[in-house]
Amino acid sequence: MEKPRGVRCTNGFSERELPRPGASPPAEKSRPPEAKGAQPADAWKAGRHRSEEENQVNLPKLAAAYSSILLSLGEDPQRQGLLKTPWRAATAMQYFTKGYQETISDVLNDAIFDEDHDEMVIVKDIDMFSMCEHHLVPFVGRVHIGYLPNKQVLGLSKLARIVEIYSRRLQVQERLTKQIAVAITEALQPAGVGVVIEATHMCMVMRGVQKMNSKTVTSTMLGVFREDPKTREEFLTLIRS
């Protein structure tokens, strides 16, 4: 049987040939200019930043970039232990940033319910994994979300899905906190929203100051959570309990 073009067998595994480092990459698709004044927190309204088709097209280029990184580190990408590493790393990075393929409208579809509940709703200790956009290393932690409904509630699991969409991107913790709060506010129009994130940043643990036990805490308070100290204190007390 004739092998597909662009595929070779190495150590019994079939893999695509990587472009050589330094080779000119294929022409990039032009992207429409972003609207002036658009803020990161407004991204929940936008369409997908990346499609599955783009993943497939860009995977060889991403793998070639990892191969070039290995060479630049003085390694041999062709040795047995690293032979498939560029492809594994490229696939992993696409997964770590899969939030670019999802939109809030996909998640919230049919999950907003009319409900005459006017007491605080809290989901806390939501595990979160993200990638620091400054060093491309992980930061991990937990997210606590509370909101005061205004005639509508959101399926509880959808709060965790919102966290997943925004955390699976290149991020800074401050922006991530705000994006989650703004998305919930825009979707539900509640009386208020509070979001607190506690995270450990590998860029502080593995490099730089190398502080193993440091945690970064960020918060965004909107509506009555910002305006009313008693509401804010109730939320902060409940997430600590």
From Swiss-Prot:
Q: Region (Disordered): which ranges?
A: 1-56
PTM (free text): Phosphorylated.
A GO molecular function annotation here is:
GTP binding
Q: What catalytic activity does the UniProt entry give for this protein? A: GTP + H2O = 7,8-dihydroneopterin 3'-triphosphate + formate + H(+)
Primary location recorded for the protein, binned into one broad class: cytoplasm
Q: Looking at the UniProt record for this protein, which Gene Ontology cellular component terms does it annotate, in alphabetical order? A: cytoplasmic vesicle; cytosol; nuclear membrane; nucleoplasm; protein-containing complex
Q: Where in the cell is it found?
A: Cytoplasm; Nucleus
- Name one matching Pfam family: GTP_cyclohydroI
Q: Which CDD domains match?
A: GTP_cyclohydro1 (cd00642)
**Location of Phosphoserine modifications:** S51, S72
Q: Where is this site: Involved in pterin ring binding?
A: W87, F96
- Known activity regulation? GTP shows a positive allosteric effect, and tetrahydrobiopterin inhibits the enzyme activity. Zinc is required for catalytic activity. Inhibited by Mg(2+).
The Gene Ontology biological process terms listed for this entry are: cellular response to lipopolysaccharide; dopamine biosynthetic process; neuromuscular process controlling posture; positive regulation of heart rate; regulation of blood pressure; regulation of lung blood pressure; regulation of removal of superoxide radicals; regulation of serotonin biosynthetic process
The transmembrane segments are: none
What family does the database annotate?
Answer: Belongs to the GTP cyclohydrolase I family.
Q: How does it assemble?
A: Toroid-shaped homodecamer, composed of two pentamers of five dimers. Interacts with AHSA1 and GCHFR/GFRP.
Function statement: May positively regulate nitric oxide synthesis in endothelial cells. May be involved in dopamine synthesis. May modify pain sensitivity and persistence.
Q: What is this protein called?
A: GTP cyclohydrolase 1
- Which organism's genome codes for this protein? Mus musculus
The gene from which this protein is expressed is Gch1
